[in-house]
Each structure stands twice: as C-alpha cells, then as structure tokens.
Amino acid sequence: MIYLEMNHVRKSFGDLEVLKDISLKVEEGEVLSIIGPSGSGKSTLLRCAAMLETMDGGDLAYLGKQAVTMQNGKSVYAKPAVLRKIQENFGMVFQSFHLFPHYDVMKNLCDAPIHVQKRNRAEVEAQAEELL
C-alpha cells in the first residue's frame, strides 16, 4: 500500500522556485533517502510532506487519503479534521535546534505519540527505548 504520495509538488519562496514538479511514492515500510546539496529543497520537501509548509501546487496523499489536491492550478487543502487525522500518523524528527531543549531525548521522542495519538505511555516508552 502507498503510504505517502506526492505528485507535481511546487514550492517557491518569492522568486526562488525551490520545488519544481516533484513526484514520489513511498510504500508502507519502505525507506527513502532524499539526497542533495545544501539549499536544494530537501528540508522544504519534508516540511511540505509533513504539512509544516504549504505547497504552491501539487497533490499530497497518505494511505489513499487526499490531504492536498490541485484545483485550478492551486493547492487546496482538505478540511482541518481530515488533516489532523492524517497528521496523527506522520511526523518528523528535527535536527538539534528543533528539539525541546528542556526535554531529554526520551521525552522528545515520546511526547507526540502520547499527547497527539493518545497512546499508552508505557507502550510508547518501551518502543522509544527499543529505537534508541
């Protein structure tokens, strides 16, 4: 099953077009590497996938649920309730400065699954321990 699908994604910052017609599919359980030089749009692509950055154009779907569709040349986002449900299953781990500095590594890993997904604390901590 396709976990993440992005089609014809576009993103600009002013006159600088950072993402130009990017399309990709990630199957559930698949590992994907996004490689490129500094400033090539890797982080912007991930931020668009996580809906932390708005796309200027393109489609975005998770497990077949449309988060963003292209209409009349513009990206149109699904209703907030649909987006919240999708975001419960997709997240990012940021490098250094995006972590909560007053949390230890364990708390940074466990906070979202416990509070956003309402998962059992002991279960989440056991999974985090295994990952670390």
Language model: regions and residue ranges:
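Helix-to-loop junction immediately C-terminal to a conserved catalytic motif
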Residues: 50
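Conserved ABC transporter NBD signature motif
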Residues: 58-72, 127
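ABC ATPase NBD coupling module
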Residues: 67-91, 121-122
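Short coil-to-beta microelement around the adenine-binding A-loop and adjacent beta1/P-loop entry
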Residues: 16-17, 84
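Short coil-to-helix segment of the ABC ATPase nucleotide-binding domain corresponding to the Q-loop/switch region
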Residues: 103-111
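The feature captures the beta-strand-to-loop junction immediately N-terminal to the Walker
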Residues: 35-37
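ABC ATPase nucleotide-binding domain helical subdomain, centered on the C-loop/LSGGQ "ABC signature"
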Residues: 122-132
